[in-house]
Amino acid sequence: MEKKHVTVQIQSAPPSYIKLEANEKFVYITSTMNGLSYQIAAIVSYPEKRNSSTANKEDGKLLCKENKLALLLHGSQSHKNAIYQTLLAKRLAEFGYWVLRIDFRGQGDSSDNCDPGLGRTLAQDLEDLSTVYQTVSDRSLRVQLYKTSTISLDVVVAHSRGSLAMFKFCLKLHAAESPLPSHLINCAGRYDGRGLIERCTRLHPHWQAEGGFWANGPRNGEYKDFWIPLSETYSIAGVCVPEFATIPQTCSVMSCYGMCDHIVPISAASNYARLFEGRHSLKLIENADHNYYGIEGDPNALGLPIRRGRVNYSPLVVDLIMEYLQDT
């Protein structure tokens, strides 16, 4: 993997619009290569310290036997605290994990895209993940950021296009003979890129002739309009998903989809199940959409919380992820 100079700056306080738990810190991970620098904004959650003799499976708070990191990745026009990520970070830290949730460049509080004309391409996402991975592989960065000299990346949880980055990055790690995570959790990831092109054409009929389309998303504490160039969309649509099957068998995979997903067809769930047959766990949530909100008229049979007037299935997603990690 490419060598770059990576540094970590732990901030004394987060931006005013970000709330942290007592065990969390807001950080910038800075990468410099060939005279160019960029920053990845992240929140690190430190594990709950508990006496292992008091831990039991019933309370869902088993201490990890080794120092393990969980990395949380968001999707398109999103950020590090989106959907289930804040709650999942809390539960993972209670379980004994270090947790890092990041903003990809062009999103949240991270630096702008390297080339606005290209946008947030998948290649740029992979560069960001390479930078983040160096905080695990470099001993001095491990000590600075995670307060421990030994830690391994054990879990990656990714949503939507973040899942494609997760799987592609594992292929990159494998090619470099670097340690791979043991658990890969795909939340509503796309399987067939043609569906993305069709969706963009349906929502923005002239996007190809115009060279892209406008979207709205979180940027430095505000929702802003920004341009999505053709190259960004095609970098995702052109991914060869079947090659993910070559990820080593040591990586266990879980997929979680809302059965009323309005963005990614539910067929993606069964396609991933077949792709990773023998090491795949599939979870489907009735009445949930792409971001795990209930559809109109959802009876809320589970008594889940309501957010923005809709049933919020994120707590269930987190429960399913934690059950999977306890059982594998």
From Swiss-Prot:
It holds the Pfam family Hydrolase_4. Disruption phenotype: Cells are viable and do not display any phenotype. InterPro entries: AB_hydrolase_fold, Hydrolase_4. Disulfide bonds: none annotated. This is Putative uncharacterized protein YDL057W. GO terms for cellular component: membrane. It comes from the Eukaryota. Signal peptide: none annotated. PANTHER family: ALPHA_BETA-HYDROLASES SUPERFAMILY PROTEIN, RE40534P-RELATED. One of its GO terms (molecular function) is monoacylglycerol lipase activity. Coiled coil: none annotated.
